[in-house]
């Protein structure tokens, strides 16, 4: 009986948050590393289905870095990176498109359908909602077919949300001539969140959030203002690999998104715990 009462208490706690976020858009960036963890992925997709069921409007944007690298290796193509961006020649682009649009995007959609949700894969093979152009590297390096998103077809995405369906979008864009480009998944998610006027953008990571001590998960900072985050970077508290994540969060806030979250996607039901509980499980960055 005590366990049943505890479950009821949890539902009551969630009720206030459900009312608050009902009808609001949350963009969820799903990274390549989590796509390899089948158990974690299953719980994350169940979380997304729950969010849609109780009236939120989740949108999933995904990459697939590890799977792409493995597929390129099988094809005899050596992966090359310049400042974190994958150099994408014509042969590499074929592999990227096959993995993102032909495999992962379809698989994620089918998994959500099997779990009882309604999802639609929006890729260049079906309906491409990300328009863009070739990314010009500021250092002058030619990254090949690497692009940046300049326009999002929000009408298509919102029409799905209004009919209780979840859009699942790979990090690929096309230009006005139909040329395909590989896009960084973080920046693709940011563009989608900005275009939709999302209330939240959630980066699913392999760390539990911003920590005062990078080696100690117990030092997680539950909430930060944009100003506090900039100060922690200046003070050296936020450093190394966490800096680009936090800078991406700050850029997203600057584009009008209300809140950005960094959470550990490997934690069971981390999405629900972050959004529907008072304390959350990651770091929330806000203006």
Swiss-Prot record:
Keyword Kinase belongs to the record: yes
Any one GO cellular component localisation term in the record: cytoplasm
Record InterPro entries: AceGlu_kinase-like_sf, AcgluKinase_fam, ArgB, Asp/Glu/Uridylate_kinase, Glu/AcGlu_kinase, NAGK-C
CDD domains according to UniProt: AAK_NAGK-C
Keywords: Amino-acid biosynthesis, Arginine biosynthesis, ATP-binding, Cytoplasm, Kinase, Nucleotide-binding, Transferase
Alphabetical list of Pfam families matching this protein: AA_kinase
GO BP: arginine biosynthetic process via ornithine; L-arginine biosynthetic process
GO molecular function: acetylglutamate kinase activity; ATP binding
Pathway: Amino-acid biosynthesis; L-arginine biosynthesis; N(2)-acetyl-L-ornithine from L-glutamate: step 2/4
Enzyme class: transferase
Enzyme Commission code: 2.7.2.8
Catalytic activity: N-acetyl-L-glutamate + ATP = N-acetyl-L-glutamyl 5-phosphate + ADP
Chief localisation class: cytoplasm
HAMAP family: ArgB (MF_00082)
Protein name: Acetylglutamate kinase
Native organism: Rhodopirellula baltica (strain DSM 10527 / NCIMB 13988 / SH1)
